[in-house]
Amino acid sequence: MNKIIHFSIDDCIEIFRDITINNYNSLFESDYFSFFKELHDKYDAKISLYSFVEYKGFNIKNTTDKFKKEFINNSDWLKIGFHGFNESSRYNGKENIKKDYKLFIKYVKRFAGNLNIIDNFVRLHYFSGNLENILKIKKFGIKGLLTADDDRDNYYLKKNENIFLNKHNIYKDIKNEIFFIKTNLRIEKIENINETLKTIDINNNIIMFTHEQYLNDKNIRDKIIDIYEYSKETHKPDFINFVEDEFKDIKLDKIKKFIDCYIPITTCNFRCPYCYITQNNRWNDALPEFKYSAQYVRKALSKERLGGTCLLNMCGGGETLLPPYIIELLKELLEEGHYIWVITNGSLNKRFEEISKFPKNLLYRLAFKFSFHYLELKRLNKLEDYVKNIKLMQDSGASFSIEITPYDELIEYIDEIKEFSLKNFGALPHITVAREDNTDNKKILTKLSKQEYNKVWSQFNSKMFSFKLSTFLVKRKEYCYAGKWSYILDIGKGVLRQCYSNNQQQNIFENMKPIKIKSVGRKCLEPHCYNSHAFLTWGDIPRLKAPYYYEMRNRIQSDEKEWLNPYMKEFCSHKLKENNNKFNF
């Protein structure tokens, strides 16, 4: 697929003064516009002129209207966009952007004939604009904003959003339907064009710009031509079509169902003493055969059947990513539109390399819970691979979380783990609460008292640990919507259950009949909700005040990146009750 090339000029005003004070018979007798037409005729260039209303003693309201017809006839490739009222304009405060923008379109319409020439993507002066002001101009048809060519803050974006944008070159504010495209080439800063051309990644878009004051410089023009010449076979100027296509699957979704999916594998390349498979001696060295194809599972778990976008949590008894089938399954379910978390030990390099090649719009809805088996990783000399795979997933656009299963033998290594984590992950891991799975009450896996256990592991300041420990061993007697809002699913057999211990189940793979399982209600068969960090934070018990799921998974790194990308963080900031019906009692 071709990438796009977009060229724009900031601080425009002299362009319009020039055609006003000179006695040109055609717009393209102007040295400025003749250059633009040369680019268009040779490279099909589409060019945006980001203009002030007034600047350097000239106001665009005085622009001649004698070239109105030529502006109209060329408005498919020549656009005029708002840059600000003047060089002092900043829209981060109470400045009246609405008034300025209305004047701008009024004046441009007068001399350019109609509003088809107005660019609905703009680059505001100094990349300034708070949300209130951007929403004001959005009402006039503005779809998005071009952002800085460096790492500075852009408009109203939060730090995590800005970092994500600078890494992936595009970002969509899904709450407000506003697009952001990163500028990556400032022509006047290019010292050696040949060296710059070597650094251009043909797999990425070229969003280049210069300022009007440099346009008369032949060296600047030559660099622009060189870039167009270099990219003419790989990049097209279809800017708007690209944006709409790139963002079509990225939208504001609220969770419909939470489904904890069991992958029937009891094979693993690790042997951790605290693992429940180890506790119950259920290891099997053979990889499972899956009865149902990934395409069939997608159909069974379609958004239409389930009622909307779901969060699927994929967890194997052994290492989840060992079966090659899982890669195909992930891709199918992501293409269906669901969000997915995968539980993994993070050691299978090949699997992560395969996943990193997924389309970006799929990776944005994918997350990994990297189980941090520190001593096992160290024993197998896999720590370096573990870190590399985490960084690969983050760089690819996926989200992640790092989680330690605490056990008594690990306590003496806590300082070592913390030092390693801060150095390599930029933050401390989250801490879960391990259970003795072969006991009736599934008590905490420790010889310490609950108070001692809390004192030892709370030093990681994990919200996951504090919430999970607060609910551990607490029998739930409230009304629970598990069975209606959340499920347990065996991916191998297709058996869907209310919860881990349940009164009802249905095989949803054998037939595609509607799902008819009732809520657990007040008849929970478990001694306590030992996975409260998921089921209770998503809100299976609406009456219970619980944090959001993103708080169980996210961390802010020392470099201000976050473990959850903005899309996953937004999705995990909602509750099941927002998109499901509650019963009246």
Where are these regions (language model features)?
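Active-site beta->alpha N-cap acidic-glycine motif
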Residues: M1-N73, I118, M208
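Acidic (Asp/Glu)-rich catalytic clusters
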Residues: S34-A45, N59-H83, T196-I202, K303-R305, ...
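Metal-dependent polysaccharide deacetylase catalytic core of the NodB/CE4 family, i.e.
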Residues: K46-N133, D153, M208
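Active-site-adjacent pocket scaffolds in enzyme catalytic domains
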Residues: I60, N114-M208, D217-D222, F247-I250
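Canonical Radical SAM [4Fe-4S] cluster-binding loop centered on the CxxxCxxC motif
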Residues: L252-Q295
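Core AdoMet radical
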Residues: Q279-Y292, G308-L322, L333-R351, N361-D385, ...
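Radical SAM enzyme [4Fe-4S]-AdoMet core and its adjacent flexible, acidic
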Residues: H373-G492
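Accessory C-terminal segments flanking Radical SAM cores
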Residues: D440-F585
